[in-house]
Amino acid sequence: MGRKDSSNTKLPVDQYRKQIGKQDYKKTKPILRATKLKAEAKKTAIGIKEVGLMLAAILALLLAFYAFFYLRLSTNIDSDLDLDED
């Protein structure tokens, strides 16, 4: 039968593995942080597609605005010319 104390002591191999794990974690912690920051920046950054869509939408609105006023003014000019012909 084993003693109660024997459960608390760890094998030297396990202690060594734990030490290596701690050192490895300390080394990779800045790398993990940098990777997380990169992923977050990529996730929140506005992409080229979004910028292109916004520019296309603005251009379409300006074109519609211009077409509306062009057609509205051109019909007024045509009606004025018809009145002058009489």
Swiss-Prot record:
Expressed in heart, brain, spleen, lung, liver, skeletal muscle, kidney and testis. It holds the Pfam family TRIQK. Coiled coil: none annotated. It comes from the Eukaryota. It comes from Mus musculus (Mouse). This is Triple QxxK/R motif-containing protein. InterPro entries: TRIQK. It is a single-pass membrane protein. The lineage of its organism: Eukaryota, Metazoa, Chordata, Craniata, Vertebrata. It is found in: Endoplasmic reticulum membrane. GO terms for cellular component: endoplasmic reticulum membrane. Keywords: Endoplasmic reticulum, Membrane, Transmembrane, Transmembrane helix. Belongs to the TRIQK family. The keyword rRNA processing does not apply. The chain crosses the membrane at residues 51-71. May play a role in cell growth and maintenance of cell morphology. Its main location: endoplasmic reticulum.
